[in-house]
Amino acid sequence: MFNDMPVFDYEDIQLIPNKCIINSRSEADTSVQLGKYSFKLPVIPANMQTIIDETIAEQLAKDGYFYIMHRFDEESRKPFIKRMHEQNLIASISVGVKEYEYDFVTSLKEDAPEFVTIDIAHGHANSVIKMIQHIKKELPETFVIAGNVGTPEAVRELENAGADATKVGIGPGKVCITKVKTGFGTGGWQLAALRWCAKAARKPIIADGGIRTHGDIAKSIRFGATMVMIGSLFAGHLESPGKLVEIDGETFKEYYGSASEYQKGEHKNVEGKKILLPTKGHLSDTLTEMKQDLQSSISYAGGNDLAALRRVDYVIVKNSIWNGDSI
C-alpha cells in the first residue's frame, strides 16, 4: 500500500490554473470556518514560545485571526483565558498529557476556553485519546484539536475519541529534527501525508509544518487542510517573542523548536534546534501579504473562495519548480 502511494512535498507540486471568474483578486474571500467561528485567514501561527505570546494572541484575536497560545507558561493559562473573555475575545490554549493537566482541565469548567489544543510530538497515543475524552467530558462545548499525527489510522482514532480537528505533521518544520534523530516522520513528504490523512478525515485537518512559501498555504488547502499552522514564516518579526541578537550590525531573532533543549531547559530527548532569522517587519504586514497571495491563488483556481482551491488539478514536478533557486 505504502509503495503505491504517490510521495511528494510542497516543492514537488504545481497547481494548474482555471479560468478566472472574478474582476479583481481583492474580491476573493479568504475566510475560513472552524467550529462555530469564522476567521480571516486559514493560517495559525505555530504555538511555539518564539512565535506567539499573550500580546500577539490578543492582537490576533482582536483582528479576526485564529491563534493557539503555547503551553509553556502553565501558570498563566487561566488568567489568560479570563483576560480574553473579559474583552469578549476567544480563548485558545494548549495542554499536554501529564497527570496534572487533568486537574487543570477540570478547573476550567467555570470559564471554559473556546479552543483547547492537545499538543504533543507523537499524537497517536493512548495518552492523547485519554485526554481528548477527559476534555470532552469536562468541557463539552470546547473545540478540541489533537495532534500531531501522520497517518489515516491516527486521524480516525483521535476523531473517534472526540477530537474536533486533528493536526497533521511529524517533524517537517524548519527547526524540527525528529526525522534525523528518530528516523520517523513526515519530513520530505508532508504534503503527501496531508493528502493521505485528509482522505480518511471526517472533521477538519490542520496541516502543521513544512510551509516555506505563501503558495504552500494554497497547496495545503488543495490537499485537504482546513487550516495551516506555520512557524518560520511567522518568526522573526519585530513583535516576535524570540530574543533579539545583533551580529555585525545586523539584527536577528531566535527561533527554536518546542522539543529543543532551549525550550526544555535540558538536553534530554531533544528533537528540535535553534536558528537565527533576520528580523522582518511587522506581523500585520506578513498577514496582509499572505491574504493578498491567497486571494491571487483563489483567482488562479477559478473561484471566489477557498473551496475553489480544493478542485484544481496539479502536476508532480519533483523539486524542479525552483530551477536551482533556493527559497
Swiss-Prot record:
What PROSITE patterns is this protein classified in?
IMP_DH_GMP_RED
Task: Work out whether the entry's keyword set contains Transmembrane.
Answer: no
Where does the record place the catalytic residues? 176 (thioimidate intermediate)
Q: Can you tell me which family this protein belongs to? A: Belongs to the IMPDH/GMPR family. GuaC type 2 subfamily.
EC numbers, comma separated: 1.7.1.7
InterPro entries in the record, alphabetically? Aldolase_TIM (IPR013785), GMP_reductase (IPR050139), GuaC_type_2 (IPR005994), IMP_DH/GMP_Rdtase_CS (IPR015875), IMP_DH_GMPRt (IPR001093)
GO CC terms on record?
Answer: cytosol; GMP reductase complex
Molecular function (Gene Ontology), one example: GMP reductase activity
State the name under which the record lists this protein: GMP reductase
Q: Which reaction does it catalyse?
A: IMP + NH4(+) + NADP(+) = GMP + NADPH + 2 H(+)
SMART domains in UniProt: IMPDH
What keywords is this UniProt entry annotated with? NADP, Oxidoreductase
Top-level taxonomic group: Bacteria
Q: Where does NADP(+) bind?
A: 205-228
Which EC class heads this enzyme's classification? Answer: oxidoreductase
Has the keyword Ion transport been applied to this entry?
A: no
Function field: Catalyzes the irreversible NADPH-dependent deamination of GMP to IMP. It functions in the conversion of nucleobase, nucleoside and nucleotide derivatives of G to A nucleotides, and in maintaining the intracellular balance of A and G nucleotides.
Please cite one Gene Ontology biological process associated with this protein.
purine nucleotide metabolic process
